[in-house]
Amino acid sequence: MTIAEEKQAQRTAGRAARKALDAPQRAAANAVLCRRVLELDAYRTAHTLLLYAAFGGEADLAAVAAEAARQGKTVAYPVCGEGFSLTAAVPGADGWAMGQYGIRTPVLERSALLQPEQLDLVLVPCTAFDAGCYRVGMGKGYYDRYLPRCTRAVKIGIALELSLIHIS
């Protein structure tokens, strides 16, 4: 099996594990995950966060976003662009639309934009991960290109425990 085939198999396994959860299990797992994020020093000290809008059974950080907003933190979301680029956008009240992958996404024209080096904390969705915390994403490399530019941010991969897989 090639590396590309192996990664695709890992993505498939990660997505299947997420979809196997029923609604009460998913809600309980998301509540535990969000509570743990809110307890992190990296969260407590962050003023500017990049989260994501959950899609396809991803770990849902809506509770983290709500608490961060309540605390006066700046909450940005990724917008996928040309050349597999990401932009961090803080949406206004009417600043949301369905993005190119069917993901709820900020509308750039109605959002404040942040530079990667302005972020204090980046919570990165993981399709799967291993015991060494190596992340497997969706496969387009958006975050792989973006994260090195987040020079002052703490970067944390986010996934439910069931997304833990064996990566050889």
Predicted regions and their residues:
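Short beta-strand segments
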Residues: 52-54, 78, 124-125, 157-159
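Active-site beta-strand/loop microenvironment that shapes enzyme catalytic pockets
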Residues: 14, 118-157
